Swiss-Prot record:
Residues 1-19 form the signal peptide. This is Secreted LysM effector ldpB. PROSITE patterns: LYSM (PS51782). GO terms for cellular component: extracellular region. The keyword Nucleotidyltransferase does not apply. Residues 46-91, 135-182, 211-258 form the LysM domain. The LysM (lysin motif) domains are small globular domains involved in binding chitin in eukaryotes. LcpB contains 3 LysM domains. Its main location: secreted. It is found in: Secreted; Secreted, Cell wall; Secreted, Extracellular space, Extracellular matrix. It comes from the Eukaryota. Keywords: Cell wall, Chitin-binding, Extracellular matrix, Glycoprotein, Repeat, Secreted, Signal, Virulence. Cell wall chitin of A.fumigatus recruits lung eosinophils during infection and ldpB might have a role in sequestration of chitin and act as triggers of host immunity to dampen host defense.
Length: 299
C-alpha cells in the first residue's frame, strides 16, 4: 500500500471517528418510535431514530451515562446491548444516578454564583430562566447538559431543562460563556386558578377541570406535570390534544388543565322500607257490624 493510500485511510478513519463523536440524535420528552416493553416508567427523556450502526457506547458517551444506567432504563439491552434500528431509547429517568467528583478539582473549575439578588444576576443569561434561581454556572466550551448535571450531582435533567428552557429539549442551545441556572429557592406550590379557564384552551379539555397553567415559551409537557405534582399520563388524559403530537402542539399563551374536580359517585336511591300489614289480634275489639249480627243470631 502506497503512502497516499495510507494517508487516505487515516483521514477516513479520523473522519468516521469524529462523526461518531459529534453525531446528534433527535431527542424529546416522549418517544417517537418503538420502545423497550419494560422501559423505565419514569423515563423523562428519549433518544429517537437510532440508526443501524449506532452503538450503546455512542449513546453513553454522548449523554454521559453509564452502561448500567442505559440497561437499567432499557432492560432489553441487557444481553448484548444491541440497538434496534428506528427505535427510541430512554436516556434519563428520575432515578438518574450521578458520579461524584473530587471537591478540590470541582471547585477549581466551577465558575458559579450562588445566593444572588435580582439586581446582581450574572450576565449574560438566556431567556426563560427560572425566576427563583439562586445558583448559576458559567458554561465552558465542551460542556453538555449531562456533564453539568453530573458535576453538581444535586439536581436532575428534568430540573435543569425546567430551569433553563432556552437550552432546548436536546441541549442544542447550550452556549459557552452564558450562565445557566443550577439551583432554585424553595417556593410554595402553584395556587389553583379558578374553575373557568382564564384564557384559550386546547380542544378536549375536561369540563371538570379546576386548575389551569398558562403555557410559556419553552414549557414542555413533562416540566408542567412535574411542576404541579401530576403524572405525564394524567396530563395527557386531561389535555388529549397534545398527546398525538408528542407535546409539539403545546401552544404558548394557551391554558392547559393540571387538575380536575373529583366526580361525585352515583348514589342509589334508597328503596322504601316495607311497612308491616295490620292484622287482627285476639286483643283487638271486634268490629261493631259483626258484633251486632252475632247478637241477633244468638238471641
Amino acid at each position: 500500500m502506497g503512502l497516499t493510500s495510507i494517508l487516505i485511510a487515516q483521514v477516513l478513519f479520523l473522519g468516521a471517528a469524529n462523526s461518531a463523536v459529534v453525531k446528534r440524535w433527535p431527542c424529546s420528552v416522549s418517544p417517537t418510535g418503538p420502545t423497550d416493553p419494560s422501559v423505565a416508567k419514569n423515563c423523562g427523556y428519549w433518544v429517537n431514530d437510532v440508526a443501524k450502526n449506532d452503538q450503546c457506547a455512542d449513546l453513553e458517551g454522548y449523554f454521559d451515562i453509564s452502561r448500567e444506567e442505559l440497561v437499567n432504563w432499557n432492560p432489553s439491552l441487557k444481553e448484548n446491548c444491541r440497538l434496534q434500528n428506528g427505535h427510541s431509547y430512554c436516556v434519563a429517568a428520575s432515578d438518574l444516578t450521578t458520579r461524584s467528583t473530587d471537591s478540590a478539582e470541582e471547585a477549581s473549575r466551577m465558575d458559579m454564583a450562588t445566593g444572588v439578588e435580582a439586581a446582581d444576576l450574572p450576565s449574560p443569561t438566556q431567556g426563560g430562566l427560572a425566576a427563583n434561581c439562586n445558583a448559576f454556572y458559567k458554561v465552558k466550551t465542551g460542556d453538555s447538559c449531562w456533564s453539568i448535571i453530573n458535576d453538581f450531582g444535586n439536581f436532575s435533567i428534568y430540573d435543569f431543562y425546567r430551569w433553563n428552557p432556552s437550552v432546548g429539549q436536546s441541549c442544542e442551545a447550550l452556549y459557552p460563556d452564558y450562565y445557566v441556572c443550577i439551583g432554585v429557592q424553595e417556593q410554595e406550590p402553584p395556587v389553583a386558578t379558578p374553575t373557568n379557564p382564564p384564557g384559550p384552551v386546547l380542544s378536549g379539555t375536561p369540563a371538570n377541570c379546576n386548575k389551569y397553567h398558562k403555557v410559556l415559551s419553552g414549557d414542555n409537557c413533562w416540566a408542567i406535570a412535574n411542576q404541579y405534582g401530576i403524572s405525564l399520563d394524567q396530563f395527557y388524559s386531561w389535555n388529549p390534544a397534545v398527546k398525538p403530537t408528542s407535546c409539539q402542539s403545546l401552544l404558548p399563551d394557551y391554558y392547559v388543565c393540571v387538575g380536575v374536580a373529583e366526580t361525585p359517585s352515583a348514589t342509589a336511591t334508597p328503596q322504601p322500607t316495607p311497612q308491616p300489614q295490620q292484622s287482627s289480634s285476639p286483643d283487638q275489639p271486634m268490629p261493631q257490624p259483626i258484633l251486632s249480627r252475632l247478637l241477633r243470631i244468638l238471641l
